[in-house]
Amino acid sequence: MFMFEKPHGMRDTLPMLYETKKKVRSSLTEVMALWGYQFMETPALEFYDTVGVQSAILDQQLFKLLDQEGQTLVLRPDMTAPIARVAASKLHKDDHPLRVGYAANVFRAQEREGGRPAEFEQVGVELIGDGSTSADAEVIALVIFSLKNAGLTSFKISIGHVGILDALFVEVLGNEERAHVLRRYLYEKNYVGYREHVKSLNLSSIDKSRLLELLELRGGIETCSRAASIVDSEKGKRAVLELETLWETLGDYGCTDDIKLDLGMVSHMSYYTGVLFEIYAENVGFPIGNGGRYDQLLGRFDSPAPATGFGIRTDRLLEALKPAEEQEKIDVVIFSTEQRKEAIRFAEEERRKGKKVVMQDLAGIGDIDQMTKSFQNVTYFIGARKEEKHG
């Protein structure tokens, strides 16, 4: 092992990228705060038996360790389950919706050949205690306004509904075991495999057509009427109606140009129970964020409540934005012992104006010309007199 190597999947964030990332994060959280979401933090370490089990992240992707008492801990793999834990135990005591936001790193072990980060930042919100379609529309509208404030102009939010898939698969296939195979094809977006498997099933031609029609249910509001024609149950009809209401509400927000329906969507997050969505941007091969309704998760913490939310991956958002990493505008004051006091006062005055200023003793510099190249302005306090140079 080389001394400069990092653990698999871990990455350094150097100063210029750090500043760019900070600006993007701030542009997201600014909008979320304006919508009344209050930000919070949770521990990086959680108990495996609570947050680890409830996180919906595959067990092999969890970073596990033992504490001194022999209890299994995990590095948090997402933020939804930790916030659900806090909301169930401390926050959601009153009978009114709770709006919280977060910006935090999460940890997921990756296969060595995958090349994906094992630690990445998520910025998002959770709306807890409101089971209405208005709440679903709010979080989708909020993610749209937040992304636009970050400077992203070309993106689309694909919206699905767990209830439509559940209803169709139960009606046609009869049990979850048979449905699981089709869900897997949809999750992997292996539509050829999905079609071939449907054709191989011992079903009537009508039922096969219903399953195959699911792949065509993508587009605008007209998709809902087509969806209604392939589901018979009350649960399925209700899910279609929810999507119609959601579309109408997002129209009131002025957001319908940024959304589309994809009723064959299956998420890797198993706790979603209703509306779910993924955010896609140009030139990025994976969703830059996702969200949805998870009405059963808080019940697992003995505090049943409806909830919905989303998380944006800042690393993928940066990939979509492709912002130029600009050198920070920092000034430097180079001083000698004789004028140290004057140099300190000058630097303090500049900082009060909002400027970033480095104080550097001349005695600590090896190559003064090389050092000053990285600063915007250079001011000297050396010997008996002061002189300035602007670079």
UniProtKB/Swiss-Prot annotation:
Write the record's keywords in alphabetical order, separated by commas.
Amino-acid biosynthesis, Cytoplasm, Histidine biosynthesis
Top-rank lineage group of the source organism? Bacteria
The metabolic or biological pathway listed in the UniProt record of this protein is:
Amino-acid biosynthesis; L-histidine biosynthesis; L-histidine from 5-phospho-alpha-D-ribose 1-diphosphate: step 1/9
GO CC annotation: cytoplasm
Q: What's an example of a GO molecular-function annotation for this chain? A: histidine-tRNA ligase activity
> What Gene3D superfamilies does its record include?
3.40.50.12590, Bira Bifunctional Protein, Domain 2 (3.30.930.10)
The record's listing under InterPro entries reads: aa-tRNA-synth_II, aa-tRNA-synth_II/BPL/LPL, HisRS-like_core, HisRS/HisZ, HisZ, HisZ-C
The main location class comes to cytoplasm
Tell me the Pfam families matching this sequence. Answer: HisZ-like, tRNA-synt_His
Instruction: Name where it's found.
Output: Cytoplasm
Q: What's this protein's function?
A: Required for the first step of histidine biosynthesis. May allow the feedback regulation of ATP phosphoribosyltransferase activity by histidine.
Q: What else is known?
A: This function is generally fulfilled by the C-terminal part of HisG, which is missing in some bacteria such as this one.
- Give the family from UniProt: Belongs to the class-II aminoacyl-tRNA synthetase family. HisZ subfamily.
Subunit composition and interactions:
Heteromultimer composed of HisG and HisZ subunits.
Q: Which named protein is this?
A: ATP phosphoribosyltransferase regulatory subunit
Organism this protein belongs to: Bacillus licheniformis (strain ATCC 14580 / DSM 13 / JCM 2505 / CCUG 7422 / NBRC 12200 / NCIMB 9375 / NCTC 10341 / NRRL NRS-1264 / Gibson 46)
Traced from the root, the source organism's taxonomic lineage reads: Bacteria, Bacillati, Bacillota, Bacilli, Bacillales
What gene name does this entry carry?
hisZ
